[in-house]
Amino acid sequence: MSACESNDLLKWCVIGAGPSGLTALKNLLQCGIQAECLEREDDLGGNWYFGSSTSRVFESTKLISSKSLTEFTDFPMPHEWPAYPDHKQCLAYLHQYSDYFGLREHILFQNSVTRITPITRNHVRQGWQVDLEDGTTRNYAGLIFASGHNH
């Protein structure tokens, strides 16, 4: 089975719309797997979303790895940017990436996950029930956690 083959026709969930969540979402969709992303903030970017309740960057934050080592292989950072972009450029890059690959329409913003429970039938796991802070519940075939190492 290739990396893009799937026998499951149900939707997958990516939790977190930072760099890892965006790439996970893009790859699922490119493989033809139905997917959506749950993001607790009102916009994407994860840690690079300066000023959000979860961001840990400072006003002066810049990449500590060069853009050539940090950029996604299928979406290079602008050539005219410095070798070590600042946090505003990193966030802009993630927005450009999301727009280029059509990810934004698959992201559900301001959705905090409060609980995850396996869905089982006859003692066999069939998927996952995800409870959200607003009281709604969503069911998924699988989950990818991209919520950062502090969450």
Explain the meaning of each model-derived region.
Residues S20, D42-L44, T54, F75-M77, ...:
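Short, solvent-exposed loop/turn segments at secondary-structure junctions
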Residues I15, T137-H151:
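Short hydrophobic core segments
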Residues F109-G127:
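A conserved short coil-to-beta-strand element within the FAD-binding core of flavoproteins
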Residues F101-H106:
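A structural motif corresponding to the C-terminal end of an alpha-helix
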Residues R40-D42, N47-Q96:
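Glycine-rich active-site loop/strand segments that organize a redox cofactor
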Residues A35, I107-F109:
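Generic structural signal for residues in well-ordered beta-strands
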Residues C4, L9-C37:
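N-terminal Rossmann-like FAD-binding beta1-loop-alpha1 element of flavoenzymes
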Residues L10, D131-G142:
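Core beta-strand elements of the Rossmann-like FAD/NAD(P) dinucleotide-binding domain
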